[in-house]
Amino acid sequence: MKEIFFNEPLKIKSSINNVKKFLISNKPLHGPGENILKIKQLLLKNFGFRNVFLTNSCTSALEICSLAINLKPSDEIIVPSFSFITSASSFARTGCKIKFCDIEKKTLMPSLKNISSCITKKTRAIVIVHYQGYSVDYIEKLKKICNSKKIFLIEDAAQAFGSY
C-alpha cells in the first residue's frame, strides 16, 4: 500500500532564497518593512479589501477579534468541534461560553444546519474555519443569518487563504 503523507512540507527554492536574502539584510524582524507593505498592497489590490491588518499568526488575529467584539461572560460563541485549539481558546479567555458545533464527516466542517441549531439569543459570534484549502459553500447564507441576528461572523482562513 502506498503511503499518503498528510501536510508534507513543500520547499520552494525561491521562498528559501527570499528568506535567506531577508535574514542576510539585517533588517528588523518586526514592524512595517518593505515586504509587509508589499503584501498589504497585494491584498488590497487583488481581493478588494478596504483595510488590511496583518498579524504574526491566526492565533493573534483571533485574539484581536475576541477583544474587538467585547465579549462578556454571558455571551456565547460557536466554534467547530474539529479545529486548532485557538479557534476556541482565543475567545475562552474573555470568559464567554464556547459552544462546539458538530462537523460533517465528509468536509470536517460544520454544516449550516448544525450551526443554526447551536444559535441562541446569547450567541454573539460564530467562528468558521475554512479547512485544508476548502471554504464552506454556504458562507453567503451564513452572512445573512448573522446579519439578521446581529451575530459577528469570524472567518478563520489560515488554512485556506484565497480559496472560495
Predicted regions and their residues:
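Active-site phosphate-binding strand-loop segment of PLP-dependent enzymes
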Residues: 106-164
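Structural detector of well-ordered beta-strand residues that form the stable sheet scaffold
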Residues: 53, 78, 99, 152-154
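Flexible loop residues that form catalytic
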Residues: 57, 82, 131
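Alpha-helical elements of the RecA-like P-loop NTPase motor core of helicases
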Residues: 63, 88-89, 136, 140
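Alpha-helix N-cap/loop-to-helix initiation residues
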Residues: 12, 62, 84, 108, ...
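Conserved PLP-anchoring active-site segment centered on the Schiff-base-forming lysine
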Residues: 65-119, 127
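Conserved PLP-binding active-site segment in aminotransferase class I/II-type PLP enzymes
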Residues: 1-68, 72, 128, 142, ...
